[in-house]
UniProtKB/Swiss-Prot annotation:
Matching PANTHER family: DEOXYADENOSINE KINASE, DEOXYNUCLEOSIDE KINASE
Alphabetic keyword roster: ATP-binding, Nucleotide-binding
Disulfide bridge map: none
Coiled-coil segments on the chain, per record: none
GO molecular function, one term: deoxynucleoside kinase activity
Protein name per its UniProtKB record: Uncharacterized protein MG268 homolog
One Gene Ontology cellular component annotation held by this UniProt entry: cytoplasm
Binding site for ATP: 22-29
Organism annotation: Mycoplasma pneumoniae (strain ATCC 29342 / M129 / Subtype 1)
Gene3D superfamilies membership: P-loop containing nucleotide triphosphate hydrolases
Length: 229
């Protein structure tokens, strides 16, 4: 039986948070930082932190694909647990928090990277337990911003940002990137529908200013107790 791409829980509360999600290199961090400038008192929680040497090591080992049966599961478990810890601590601050990607997207990365069924079964069980706590105790985000674009935009942005680990290992990971790209947008939309998460879909091939303006208009329409500046 194939593992379904759709989680099956329903939300219990809304967190004081926004998530910016989407395919690798579509500009999530840039958009998150731009939104933070317009939401008074808000902060950005980054997916990757400069001082996190373990995350850098695991990411590099995964992309190198020399021992992916070991490093891919370690990478996915580390990111999932680390992201959940950040979310539960920061998702209900007095002022909005903007998250660079979410734990929902971690499942998709894990599905593409963990190749041993027994290990993925363990990961899936762990992930489901974490997500139950997230949605019932801490809450789903008030808005999920989904950045979409074409394959050409992905390649352009990936090489433009020039992260050594991605460029050096692009050939090894091209099929992985293509498979991820094909299902990414629909997966996030399905997650939002299944979890009852309010979301907006934005074309990533626009200026930062244009995307920011569109998202702020959506936030204004939701009548949240957030000060937009």
């Amino acid at each position: 039986m194939k593992t379904p791409l759709k989680p099956k829980f329903q939300p219990a509360k809304i967190a004081n948070a926004v998530v910016v999600g989407g395919m690798i290199a579509f500009g999530k961090t840039t958009i998150a930082e731009s939104l933070a400038k317009h939401l008074k008192g808000s902060k950005v929680i980054y997916e990757l932190e400069e001082q996190d040497q373990l995350a850098d090591l695991l990411l590099a080992k995964m992309y190198e694909r020399n021992d992916e049966l070991l490093y891919a599961p370690l990478f996915q478990l580390y990111f999932t647990l680390n992201r959940f810890n950040k979310y539960r601590k920061e998702c209900n601050n007095k002022t909005p928090t903007i998250f660079d990607r979410s734990i929902f997207e971690d499942w998709l990365f894990a599905k593409q990277n963990i190749h041993r069924p027994s290990i993925f079964t363990y990961y899936n069980h762990l992930w489901n337990g974490i997500v139950k706590e997230l949605i019932f105790k801490h809450g789903i985000p008030a808005l999920y911003v989904i950045l979409e674009g074409d394959w050409e935009l992905f390649e352009q942005r990936l090489f433009q940002r020039n992260r050594k680990v991605e460029i050096d290992n692009f050939a090894k990971n091209k099929d992985y990137f293509k498979n991820l790209y094909k299902i990414y947008g629909e997966f996030i939309k399905n997650v939002c529908y299944d979890f009852g998460i309010s979301h907006c879909i934005v074309n990533a091939n626009q200026s930062v200013e244009s995307i920011t303006k569109q998202v702020l208009e959506v936030l204004k329409s939701k009548n949240l107790d957030w000060e937009i500046i």
